[in-house]
Regions:
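Substrate-binding groove of N-acetylhexosamine-processing glycoside hydrolases
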Residues: 2-177
Length: 177
């Protein structure tokens, strides 16, 4: 596989899980394999539900020298519901995500917005225990990516409800980086 990737001039990418230490924690694992292998994969870091201790995973990867893309489930997943209304489409496994979450997040400093921190019960003691991206490693932060998983998209109306407003907010955030 590696020789095919190199021969084709491609770059191996994948969800962050491909570079995590295998353990009973599964997708909640916080320990990263430090080796870059011989194909220098780019992890798309997605699993960062608030208050689960993984909000800073993107910075850990970048500080280890991995080029990374933020695919933040608690801000950039368009299939997350914004509240508990049972008539809303969307899921809630990464919390309730509204437009403000996507707009307010600073991808290079996830805890910089005091309103978001308060909304998610994040205090300074919690923030002090997290990793920050080092200035010399900002170059490893390639950008942000949004997702719309379609388990709950049953027709065009649901697609429009989940996608259209979110993509506008996301585009504003992506263009401002």
């Amino acid at each position: 596989l590696v020789s095919m990737i190199k021969k084709g001039g491609a770059t191996m990418t994948g969800w962050e899980d491909i570079l995590l230490i295998q353990s009973s924690e599964s997708q909640n694992e916080k320990n990263i394999r430090s080796e870059h292998f011989n194909y220098d994969p780019i992890p798309f870091v997605w699993n960062n539900t608030w208050r689960e201790g993984r909000e800073d995973m993107i910075y850990k990867f970048a500080n280890l020298g991995f080029r990374t893309v933020m695919s933040n489930s608690s801000a950039f997943y368009f299939d997350m519901s914004d509240n508990k209304d049972f008539e809303n489409y969307g899921l809630d496994w990464s919390g309730y995500v509204d437009y403000f979450d996507a707009w307010a997040i600073d991808p290079l400093d996830i805890f910089s917005n005091k309103v978001l921190n308060a909304k998610h019960g994040i205090d300074q003691n919690y923030i002090n225990k997290t990793e920050k991206i080092k200035p010399e490693n900002v170059k490893n932060f390639l950008g942000i990516q949004s997702q719309l998983w379609t388990e709950t998209v049953i027709d065009n109306n649901v697609f429009d409800e989940l996608f259209v407003p979110n993509i506008i907010v996301f585009a504003e955030k992506a263009l401002s980086l």
